[in-house]
Amino acid sequence: MNQIEQKWQQIWHDEKAFEVSNESSKPKYYVLAMLPYPSGKIHLGHVRNYSIGDVIARFMTMQGFNVLHPMGWDAFGLPAENAAIKNNSHPKDWTYSNIENMKKQLKSMGFSYAWSREINSCDPQYYKHEQKFFLELYERNLAYQKESLVNWDPVDNTVLANEQVVDGRGWRSGAVVEKRYLKQWFLKITDYAEELLNEIQNLKEWPEAVRSMQEKWIGKSIGANFHFKIKDNEDTTIEVFSTKPETIFGAGFIGIAFNHPIIERLVSKTPEISNFIAKCANITCSVELDKAEKEGVFTGLYVTHPFDSNIVLPVIITNFVLMDYGTGAVFGCPAHDERDHELAVKMNLTIKKVIETDIDVQKTPYTEDGILVNSNFLNGLTSNEAKQKVIEEFEKLEIGKCTINYRLKDWGISRQRFWGCPIPMIHCEACGIVPVPYKDLPVTLPDDVSFDGHGNPLAHHPSWKHVNCPKCNKPAIRETDTFDTFFESSWYFTRYCNSNATEMTDKKACDYWLPVDKYIGGIEHAVMHLLYARFFTKVMNEQHYVSVREPFKGLFTQGMVLHATYKDEHNNWLYPEEVVKKGNEFFRKESNDRVVQGRIEKMSKSKKNLIDLETMQKQYGADAIRLFVLSDSPPEKDLEWFVSGIEGCSRFINKLEQMFEAIKFLYNEANKEEFEGNTERSTAAYTLVREDASTGSMYKLPLEASYINKELNRLVHFTIKHVAEDIKHFALNRAIARMRELANAISSEISKDKIDVNTVRHGFNILVQLLNPFIPHITEEIWQKLGNKERLYKSDFPAFDESMLELDTYIMAVQVNGKLRDTYKFKTAASEDAIKQITVNLPKVQKFLAGKEPKKIILVPRKIVNIIVN
């Protein structure tokens, strides 16, 4: 099998089979799988992702489209730097070596990539364009630097975006994230928050889950900003933001963030307050707030109510208010908010009902809208009416106004690491921040760098960071931070349109190819990569690099590949190949020690539940692997890898070869000539009959005695139609099931004593075409042996004949007074009168008629006959 696969991979390479032109009379189709990080080896998660994309690309090519299906490398990142530290080498060497190996692996899987368009994000000829783009953003005030409280990963020694903090830990290292103030570069993604939100509804071909995640991440809130005066210090106020200002008369406290400016100005930091602030500093993002137990500490401050100076409210430092959302302060309404209620109960704060309800709000908050009560001038109004009214009052008193807030924050792009794209800025004592001139781009990374595992090597480099200021020519310092690696992946899909363009994009090529018709990748990128790419596309549109404002028309998120985990008696993880199953128990191959099978989980290096791709390829071949990862589960669901599954796929491929040999024999018997030439369906039927089962001898029936297996012929056309529909809807496992059914039907016909050779041969020819996008190597081989002169990858997808889908017979349910009494198979041509006459005389029906004449006979065509009798 490996020889056949290598043969066709070489043919595709020599014929430039999957290279496409930017100019074609055909309609375009751009299918793209998320580019991989070159970690060293392709894993089965990659294989599943890329197999899905390859089926779509090959299918759309057969459908007559000009298909762009490229591949490249998201090549910057921490693993390369960590490997450099470990191996005392340069990250570039490690990265390029990995790319070479992984590219070889991808080619060995037969993926139909246009390799001439390959991109590598760590290539200066790639990242020089994004450096220029960053400078353009800076000129438009869409990029800026400020001191900010950041998420600091103490293991990777770098800043993390909120999205990269998972349950309080770094998404790569797993280290507990700390809070630090650092100067950081930001992009103003918030300037596009409204458009990013509004356009979600137009992404009709995106999964609802992803659209919902983006909506929640952008998090638009309409409410009000207004001020509370500090009691006994009325010149000082606390500004709060609230999405429910109408509940102001139910206020029980003011909640502020642990780093709110008023704490430094007015609060005496007792040990209790200091300890609480330190604890709050470890909460990194609003996702964690929802999970944390609600806690607070009293500051000693009070504020007065804006509409009733007799009401004073305590100011509480809480662990669920963040400084980077709204104003960093809220008023708590415990009767009508779950978080506020939890804190109020814990701290014995006032809980006052202001929305009519029968619920005891002292025990449970009522969080729905309703009619206002206990609310002075708002009494009797609905929640919406009261919201408008109270905002009007704020504006009259000049203490507040209507405000829109977003959960989305500006994108922090600074990373204190070496292996990333240098930020093209210079810091001059005399001139301040100075952009690197366009003519000096790219700013490249130094080759002579040492890694000791501490901090940023660029900041410690003896010469690289020293440069003269472009404005005053005095000594200055380069920016030593590098871009977040999501910067590179936020525009790479535009570069594939012409990877040799002298500018960031070839706009003419982008106008032809964009948007991407189908983008394929994991749902874990819903609120990072996918949101950033949408943002970049909008800015690139304004910079005239592209004409579209949304990058991806369609999105498909595939499930993960899972495998059982194993541990020895000492709680050490084991690789699957180290384990053998005996009966219902597991043992270590080498020592025969007992092994514990754990949960079935996502394949990962840490738990060693990995399957080596190269080992599988040598044993089963690329086609069998492709078939298994596509056939065992719907592509959007998780897939469990198990040996019996891949073995079954290997047997199916072997069966195809055996079927070919059998059909070749039948054809030769029928025609007494070589099996070659035109494979189109012959108009003349011919039938072979087995003369002697023991010898295999056969004879051909005369034409007038031949028969056509109409059911098999119908199944061929049915399969063509529904496989095409299944592929279009990404129901790839269902498409494979249909093709297996057709293969079984053909195989069954071959084994009969009386064989419709023409339909068998035609059906097999069709089957090979249908299977090609899934298992391209073996199908190309069989296609050639079938006598076809044209390459299968160049062939059209088979057409079906609608008239052939009709059955000669159909089964109807026969009822008496609405109750099922029998069924009957009718010929398609049967008239209504014939149907009525036959059903009335059926023995089972006669039994219930008991000699009576039917009062009425109701027919539901091709489904039910209902005989009504008194």
Curated annotation (Swiss-Prot):
Keywords: Aminoacyl-tRNA synthetase, ATP-binding, Cytoplasm, Ligase, Nucleotide-binding, Protein biosynthesis
Motif ('KMSKS' region) on chain: 602-606
Domain of life: Bacteria
Keyword Aminoacyl-tRNA synthetase in annotation: yes
Residues the entry annotates as binding ATP: K605
Tagged with keyword rRNA-binding: no
EC numbers on record: 6.1.1.4
PROSITE patterns per record: AA_TRNA_LIGASE_I (PS00178)
Record's signal peptide: none
Pfam families from the UniProt entry: Anticodon_1 (PF08264), tRNA-synt_1 (PF00133), tRNA-synt_1_2 (PF13603), tRNA-synt_1g (PF09334)
Catalytic activity as recorded in UniProt: tRNA(Leu) + L-leucine + ATP = L-leucyl-tRNA(Leu) + AMP + diphosphate
Alphabetical GO biological process terms: leucyl-tRNA aminoacylation
Subcellular location(s) per record: Cytoplasm
Residue window of motif 'HIGH' region: 36-46
Cellular component, GO, one term: cytoplasm
Gene Ontology MF, one: aminoacyl-tRNA deacylase activity
Family to which this protein belongs: Belongs to the class-I aminoacyl-tRNA synthetase family.
NCBIfam families hit by this protein: leuS_bact, RPE1
Protein name: Leucine--tRNA ligase
Natural source organism: Rickettsia akari (strain Hartford)
Source organism phylogeny: Bacteria, Pseudomonadati, Pseudomonadota, Alphaproteobacteria, Rickettsiales
